[in-house]
């Protein structure tokens, strides 16, 4: 049997895969402080409220453009809590993104960039997948563009109990298991 040639599939998909930078800005929070040692011995011992400044945080991940008008699917944990989202396209253009919706229980998010005629990847029908069929994982692991790995469909209709990013128990139903390498940043 001839080996499977995935070069055309890889070439067709890399243009629709984007790099996402999600920035959470510094915030000031009021917290109840520990009782001051002198208050403990000599005062009322209640402590004082204090202002703390959180550090800005930046997260990275991948996404895929699913419509020519700029809708992108990514993981919720990539954009959760973000104040600013920057989307870098395969052609190195950077656009501002905004969150349209999130689902922490399935770790999915939909974001939008402004523009039109973006390259897309068609969404397939997972019911038509067969165990043992070849699949590609395309993303930007380690902040590197257009990384492609291959594997097979290992199982279908898997269910797993997990904890969503909001701390709630979640039961993800009917996901596809693959042995394609998924590295940090492929999310």
Label the predicted regions.
Residues 1-187:
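Serine-dependent protease modules
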